[in-house]
């Protein structure tokens, strides 16, 4: 499918339907990873909007309102010619009956909210920097049944340099972690460093006990109830 999106395809439009002040955050987050032009829709200029969108290779339609019926004909026509992805930052109850508008869509993403965290997360999901496993809980008329949905895995690597950090400096953490195991300060550990919410360093070392041969892995779970006491 179209998701996660290829970031090297520069000719992308983000068509925003809803209050213009709401869409800047999603677009800014997306722009960190790929070229994309933001266009705020106006129902009084659909003809010129259609002509403008035709020059793009793909279109992301972000929806912040349930009142977008005026655009559905134009979007259906556009989706027949190029990949169109719908992203809803509105309540699920407002999209129950929108299935007909989605039949030609390359992808439909339900964010359910226009909060800042949700908009950033959805942008990251769309380029493979976060995973998504959610399923719809109700039927969307003529489109999807309850429990349906597509799992999206994280496919993009985080480069420290993209966040103002130096990989060569972070690599020295390996030596410190291994030295601690050698000195029997601990049998194993996982070191995770987040910068602006991005895991710029995430490595595992050693085992769970000195007698145990089971290695520490990124999928292991930890009880961090007393984390504040040790940091």
Task: Specify the residue positions occupied by each region the protein language model found.
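Preference for extracellular/luminal or secreted protein segments
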Residues: 1-166
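Extracytoplasmic/secreted proteins, especially bacterial periplasmic and envelope-associated proteins
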Residues: 25, 73, 117, 121, ...
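A generic structural micro-environment signature
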Residues: 8-9, 13-15, 138, 142, ...
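Short, conserved catalytic-motif segment at the N-terminal edge
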Residues: 162-224
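Residue-level signal for functionally critical sites in structured catalytic/ligand-binding pockets
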Residues: 133-135, 159-160, 180, 224, ...
